[in-house]
Curated annotation (Swiss-Prot):
The keyword Ribosomal protein does not apply. [4Fe-4S] cluster binds at C71, C75, C78. One of its GO terms (biological process) is biotin biosynthetic process. This is Biotin synthase. It catalyses: (4R,5S)-dethiobiotin + (sulfur carrier)-SH + 2 reduced [2Fe-2S]-[ferredoxin] + 2 S-adenosyl-L-methionine = (sulfur carrier)-H + biotin + 2 5'-deoxyadenosine + 2 L-methionine + 2 oxidized [2Fe-2S]-[ferredoxin]. [2Fe-2S] cluster binds at C115, C147, C207, R277. Its EC number is 2.8.1.6. Belongs to the radical SAM superfamily. Biotin synthase family. Residues 53-282 form the Radical SAM core domain. InterPro entries: Aldolase_TIM, BATS_dom, Biotin_synth/BioAB, Biotin_synthase, Elp3/MiaA/NifB-like_rSAM, rSAM.
Length: 332
């Protein structure tokens, strides 16, 4: 006799999450393994959690790539790595004036957070000073929250960034520890965890997430979500692999839009009160179902990414408005 599979009550699990009961790894995995016909029910339950903590608000973030390419690390997914042959722009540090101009552009795009990103393994003290100079001017002229993503930091660098007014520091775990050697050999998973811990100790809000679609298993996707829970990351970017031509990961099979939705929902269930951001690869992987992603996530990037093109900000504003959601804005 064929065994009848018991249907999961996603709303019940969502209610329990709102009341403080943490989802189990088994139920988190069940989200990823659910039949595609259940995805709307899953997203509806995820929205219950999202709405409880964030209402109808959507946070917008904008990136500036202040130093592009020329990175000594061999991350297989990255077009800026030493092993990449991707035809990208390569340049040293932008001037402080250019970084400040980018902040004003972020405000015009209705972003509330401005992320200053630089390629490379780790910044020198001189480079940290360069960023600090720009941060101070931005803080004087806008209400933007400043996020930095500069690579590995030592304790003194983290402390100085905090003192300068850096609100958040991004350092993604990227994938599960068991899978890390398959994507990079020049540093370790533990190196990344160490930097997240350092910025937390300095009083900076930790931003850390993952890139999905790099050959990891569904179980490993669940494990990375729980590791981010353990690290208490305040902001969790969910990136979906863009297999850039010229990188070792060129030609990797893309995730389906429904797979991406399940990942976003799972991340919301595991980290109910955290900012979940649909990040790199949003347009390519989610495609026509991008709006549905915001029923689990409460944050997106506007404008371009590091080396790939995003959609027009006006399209993002319209998407948010059409959903009946509202943008969290800051002002000059």
């Amino acid at each position: 006799m064929k065994q009848i599979q018991t249907k999961v009550d996603w709303k019940k699990i969502a209610f329990e999450g709102i009341e403080g009961k943490r989802i189990t790894k088994e139920d988190a995995l069940a989200i990823l393994e659910a039949d595609d016909t259940e995805v709307l029910e899953i997203m509806n339950a995820a929205y219950m959690i999202r709405h409880h903590y964030f209402g109808k608000k959507v946070k917008l973030n904008m990136i500036i790539n202040t130093k592009s390419g020329l990175c000594p690390e061999d991350c297989g997914y990255c077009s800026q790595s030493i092993v990449s042959e991707a035809p990208i722009d390569k340049y040293a540090w932008l001037t402080q004036e250019k970084i400040v101009e980018g902040a004003h552009e972020a405000v015009r795009r209705k972003a509330g957070t401005y992320c200053i990103v630089a390629s490379g393994r780790r910044p020198t003290d001189k480079e940290v000073n360069h960023v600090i100079g720009a941060v101070k001017e931005i803080k004087e002229t806008t209400d933007l929250k400043i996020c930095c993503c500069l690579g590995f930091l030592n304790e003194d660098q983290a402390k100085r960034l905090a003192e300068a007014g850096v609100h958040r520091y991004n350092h993604n775990l990227n994938t599960h520890a068991n899978h890390y050697d398959n994507i990079c050999s020049t540093h370790t998973y533990d190196d990344r965890v160490d930097t997240v811990e350092k910025v937390k100790q300095a009083g900076i809000s930790p931003c850390s997430g993952a890139i999905f679609g790099m050959g990891e298993t569904k179980e490993e996707r669940v494990e990375i979500a729980f590791e981010l829970q353990r690290l208490d990351a305040d902001s969790i970017p969910c990136n979906f692999l863009v297999s850039v031509k010229g990188t070792p990961f060129e030609g990797r099979k893309e995730l389906t839009p429904v797979e991406c939705l399940k990942i976003l929902a799972m991340m919301r269930f595991v980290n109910p009160s955290k900012e979940i951001r649909i990040s790199g690869g949003r347009e390519l992987n989610l495609r026509s179902v991008q709006p549905l992603g915001l029923f689990a996530a409460n944050s997106i990037f506007v404008g371009d990414y590091l080396t790939t093109v995003g959609q027009e900000s006006t399209a993002d504003w319209e998407m948010i408005q059409d959903l009946g959601f509202e943008i969290e804005e800051c002002a000059l």
